[in-house]
Amino acid sequence: MDRTLIQEILEVVEQAAIASAHLTGLGKKDEADAAAVEAMRKRMGQIQMQGRIVIGEGERDEAPMLYIGEEVGSGSGPGVDFAVDPCEGTNLCANNQRGSMAVLAASDRGGLFNAPDFYMKKLAAPPSAKGKVDIRKSATENINILSQCLGLAVSELTIVVMDRARHKGLISEIRATGARVQPISDGDVQAAIACGFAGTGTHCLMGIGAAPEGVISAAAMRALGGHFQGQLVYDPAIAQTSEWADYTKEGNIARLNEMGITDVDKIYEAEELASGKNVVFAGSGITDGLLFHGVKFEPDCTRTSSLVISTLDNTARFTNTVHIKDGAKSIALS
């Protein structure tokens, strides 16, 4: 991987974001996702690389494009593995709510954990708390550690939690410490990454979300030097989701074993979920969010706001791009 490839990866998420943004607020989440998938795959196909999707839209028989194992790119050049979520927060996009984005993680071949389509308990925190907070500890313990690491009173901390029934006890425990809870309906990738930047007002992500998105979050947090841990959730009683209504704990363990995951209780560090020598995170806002603005359509241009984080040169680049339309007469400065 090199800087030219990183620039092209940025353009991949920009094009996906623009495609979804045309459907923002129309209540068409599936169509918005499909548009992002098509745009992402098209741009990937123009890159000189031997790309492979390791986390995507589903298994080959479940998804027409960007399925797990699909080869993308020109077929020549460096081998690159991708974990993609072309429209993270499809409901947010459909309802024109904050936090939807096109996002991916990339690494050298074999550098990303091929997470199963399971749930994952997650803990994300700032670099100053790395290795000090721990997913094995209670929320109360971790909040007190965060307070010490950040030099903030517990009452000044904001903890992001997915607004799900399974988190009722977690939310109660957090509030009992005096810390503030920020519930979100979808899109925990952006919330996790926001923990890695000072000034976002987001200090920690706790709770259970999707495992594939956990790998993307881990890639970003590894590159930022932030804290991220994940642990697969296989017990339907803990996940508390209608999607697993017909699943059993024993059946889920068997599924994981079939995938080669024998230590089903393993706690994964960011460096294990994104283990490659070169790791890149790229995200582009579809709607406004914690880290960047959404796509803005203007008469003569389209504006995107994006973030690329890379271990290649240890940088986090916030990029505002003006995509000039044919025949443009006047481009406003901002």
Curated annotation (Swiss-Prot):
It comes from the Bacteria. Substrate binds at residues 88-90, 119, 164-166, 186-188. GO terms for biological process: fructose 1,6-bisphosphate metabolic process; gluconeogenesis; glycerol metabolic process; reductive pentose-phosphate cycle. Gene3D superfamilies: 3.40.190.90, Fructose-1,6-Bisphosphatase, subunit A, domain 1. GO terms for molecular function: fructose 1,6-bisphosphate 1-phosphatase activity; metal ion binding; sedoheptulose-bisphosphatase activity. One of its GO terms (cellular component) is cytosol. Mn(2+) 2 binds at residues 85, 88, 213. Pathway: Carbohydrate biosynthesis; Calvin cycle. The keyword Metal-binding applies. It catalyses: beta-D-fructose 1,6-bisphosphate + H2O = beta-D-fructose 6-phosphate + phosphate; D-sedoheptulose 1,7-bisphosphate + H2O = D-sedoheptulose 7-phosphate + phosphate. Keywords: Calvin cycle, Carbohydrate metabolism, Hydrolase, Manganese, Metal-binding. Its cofactor is Mn(2+). SUPFAM superfamilies: Carbohydrate phosphatase. Pfam families: FBPase_glpX. Mn(2+) 1 binds at residues 33, 57. The keyword Methyltransferase does not apply. Transmembrane segments: none annotated. InterPro entries: FBPase_class-2/SBPase. Its EC number is 3.1.3.11, 3.1.3.37. Belongs to the FBPase class 2 family. Catalyzes the hydrolysis of fructose 1,6-bisphosphate (Fru 1,6-P2) and sedoheptulose 1,7-bisphosphate (Sed 1,7-P2) to fructose 6-phosphate and sedoheptulose 7-phosphate, respectively. Homotetramer. This is D-fructose 1,6-bisphosphatase class 2/sedoheptulose 1,7-bisphosphatase.
